[in-house]
Amino acid sequence: MGLDDFQGQNKDELSMIEVARAILQDSGKRMAFADIVNAVQNFLGKSDEEIRERLPQFYTDMNTDGEFISMGHNVWALRSWFPYESVDEEVNHPEDEEDVPRKKHHKKVNAFIGDSDDDDIIDYDSDDPEDEDLDVDEEDTNEDDYSDDDLDDADDNELDDGIEGQLSELHQDDLDDDDE
C-alpha cells in the first residue's frame, strides 16, 4: 500500500499515521521523523499550525503502532522490513559506538533563567545555611524547661478513676443472652 492507494479519497479523512506508513512504503528506506512529517504535511496539504497541533499525537501513534520501529536518532522504518531476529541488531546503539567522534554539544539554554543576573539562581548543591544551626550546645538542652510532672507521665499505666467507674466487664453469660 502506497500513496497511490489514497488517490480519489478525501485527504481530510486520512490519518497522519496512514499517510506516514504509505510514505515509508513508497520510499523503501529509513527516514528521519522530520522528513516524514514534512512529507505527510505536503501530501495532506495541511498548514504548519494544524501539523504542529497534531504532532504530539502523531509521534505517540508512531511509537505505539506496531508497524513502525525507531532506529535511533529519531530515524524511523517499517518493522516489516526486518526479520524478527534482526530488529535489535539494526537499531543504533550509541553505547556501542565508542570509536565514532562525537559532535560538540552546544551550551543548553534554560528558558527559566534570565541571562543577565545569576544572583537569583539557586544552587541546590551548596550546603543549606540553616543546616549550620543544627549544632546542639549544652545550654540548648536545659533540663529546667521540663517539669517533673512530664517525667512521671511515662510510668502512668492506670486509667483515671473517673473513667474506670464507667467501665464494666463483659462475661460469657452476657454474650450468650444477645443470641436469644
Swiss-Prot record:
The record's annotation in Pfam families points to: HARE-HTH
Write one Gene Ontology MF term.
DNA-directed RNA polymerase activity
Single Gene Ontology BP term?
A: regulation of DNA-templated transcription
Domain HTH HARE-type, residue spans? 14-81
Q: Where is the composition biased (Acidic residues)?
A: 115-163
Top-level taxonomic group: Bacteria
Q: Which UniProt keywords apply?
A: DNA-directed RNA polymerase, Nucleotidyltransferase, Transcription, Transferase
Assembly mode: RNAP is composed of a core of 2 alpha, a beta and a beta' subunits. The core is associated with a delta subunit and one of several sigma factors.
Give the protein's biological function: Participates in both the initiation and recycling phases of transcription. In the presence of the delta subunit, RNAP displays an increased specificity of transcription, a decreased affinity for nucleic acids, and an increased efficiency of RNA synthesis because of enhanced recycling.
Q: What is this protein called?
A: Probable DNA-directed RNA polymerase subunit delta
Gene (name only): rpoE
